[in-house]
Curated annotation (Swiss-Prot):
Family: Belongs to the phosphohexose mutase family.
Xref: NCBIfam families: glmM, PRK10887.1
Protein name, entry field: Phosphoglucosamine mutase
Task performed by this protein: Catalyzes the conversion of glucosamine-6-phosphate to glucosamine-1-phosphate.
Changes after translation: Activated by phosphorylation.
Presence of the UniProt keyword Transmembrane in the record: no
GO CC annotations on file: cytosol
Record carries keyword Phosphoprotein: yes
Modified positions (Phosphoserine) in chain numbering: S100
Cofactor binding annotation: Binds 1 Mg(2+) ion per subunit.
Organism (species): Vesicomyosocius okutanii subsp. Calyptogena okutanii (strain HA)
Length: 441
């Protein structure tokens, strides 16, 4: 049986299996058939702004209908909005057509349960098993119905605003927002301006091809430049589907996911709101954040890379805060998935209440330098049996001593080997990363 699901749903190049119309048709039928085993079912489908979303939306819709499942179409919608709306519309599942921070040539799909949580490993296995079966349509009298939901944007906008302390206001704050020409393009202004902020939006004119193109959470140069040019208080960058958040301080410096998690954790602990006094992160989480949390007697729990694994551990440990340096931040007391919009509001609430700048808020954490290198691969590489790589890693770890570390892993969403060298000293980190990447040349 093929394993189609990676760490964040199914993703790949458009037109190459499994990102094809015929596969998505079969996928819709497979998921629908699994859901229909519990009785009459309905799903909602949202998508980001890439051009191929229209193709795959129609294919999934047809697959669900052929399994007897009703389909509510949302149109362009952030991933976390679909997670929320799945619950408010009382759907059995939510579907997002997106490749997150990737460019328009890629696409993919993610699924949420009726509770707004990403499908479990067991759910994914049931779907993959159904994909091996012949596609048998329901009878003509049992075909599902399709319809378009009215005003889903308004519901999500009001929900986002409700997570911000309404005794506070963003009045007087000048904020630049980069929507990555993605799914937040028609939402971000309303959320932040209605809470009082002066908003300047960039990269909010999607054309189907410019999603994440030199913009958004994975490419913040434009945002940093505009923050400085307009002398803004801060900048906010989302990725293509709105589940990631990176911020820029008033000096044009990046504030990444680990720093933002620390800012929230410190504030919530001081207010007695950090349930179980724990934060969940991944093996890529910055050492500086770990040490800063330790100094506050906040427990840090490490899991594998992927916000699904972070969420699973948060549920096990009773934690309400977790995430990744890439900007996936989960505030489980506010919502059920990583949500860039809601995470930004939590940081802004801390900023307003403390009357501090973003630069001041991040000073309590001394971030280590992380040098990240992605190595493209054509065929699968067995990292455990790669003698040259292991030897190079030993040499780099000896060079780092107790002042750093090495993480090498295969990407769960792309054909890449990801190398990360972390150290207090930037020069040493760069030297170590170069040595490891040279193994693949």
């Amino acid at each position: 049986m093929d394993n189609y699901f990676g760490t964040d749903g199914i993703r790949g190049k458009v037109g190459i299996e499994p990102i094809t119309a015929d596969f998505f048709l079969k996928l819709g039928w497979s998921v629908g058939s699994v859901l229909a085993q519990q009785g009459k079912a309905s799903v909602i489908i949202g998508k980001d702004t890439r051009i191929s979303g229209y193709l795959f939306e129609s294919a999934l819709e047809a697959g669900f209908l052929s399994a007897g499942v009703d389909v509510g179409l949302l149109g362009p919608m952030p991933t976390p909005a679909v997670a929320y709306l799945t619950q408010t519309y009382n759907a059995n599942a939510g579907v997002v057509i997106s490749a997150s921070h990737n460019h328009f040539q890629d696409n993919g799909v993610k699924f949420f349960s009726a509770k707004g949580l990403k499908f479990s490993s067991q759910d994914q296995s049931a779907i993959e098993n159904k994909l091996t079966k012949p596609m048998i349509n329901v009878g003509a009298d049992k075909i599902g119905k399709a319809y378009r939901h009215e005003q889903p944007l308004g519901r999500y906008i009001e929900f986002c605003k409700s997570t911000f302390d309404r005794t506070q206001s963003l009045l007087g704050l000048n904020i630049i927002i980069d929507c990555a020409n993605g799914a937040t393009y028609h939402i971000a202004r309303s959320v932040f301006s209605e809470l009082g902020a002066n908003i300047h939006i960039i990269n909010n004119t999607p054309d189907g091809f410019n999603i994440n193109e030199r913009c958004g959470a994975t490419n913040t140069k434009h945002l940093q430049q505009v923050v400085l040019e307009l002398k803004a208080d801060l900048g906010i960058a989302f990725d293509g589907d709105g589940d990631r958040l990176i911020m820029v301080d008033e000096n044009g410096e990046l504030v990444d996911g680990d720093e933002l998690i620390f800012i929230i954790a410190k504030a919530w602990q001081s207010q007695g709101r950090l349930v179980n006094n724990t934060v969940v992160g991944t093996k890529m989480s910055n050492l500086g954040m770990r040490y800063a949390l330790r100094d506050l007697n906040i427990q840090f729990i490490e899991v594998n890379v992927g916000d699904r694994f972070v969420m699973e551990q948060m549920q096990k440990s009773g934690s309400i805060l977790g995430g990744e340096g890439s900007g996936h931040i989960i505030c489980l007391n506010k919502t059920t998935s990583g949500d860039g919009m809601i995470s930004a509001l939590q940081v802004l609430e801390v900023l307003v209440k403390s009357q501090s700048s973003l630069t001041q808020l991040k000073q309590s954490m001394n971030k280590y330098t992380q040098i990240l290198i992605n190595i493209k691969i054509q065929t699968q590489v067995n990292l455990e049996n790669h003698t040259k790589l292991q030897q190079a890693q030993l040499e780099v770890e000896k060079m780092l001593g107790s002042e750093g570390r090495v993480v090498i892993r295969a990407s769960g969403t792309e054909s890449l080997i990801r190398i990360m060298v972390e150290a207090k000293n930037k020069i040493i980190a760069k030297k170590g990363a170069k040595k490891l990447s040279n193994v693949f040349k």
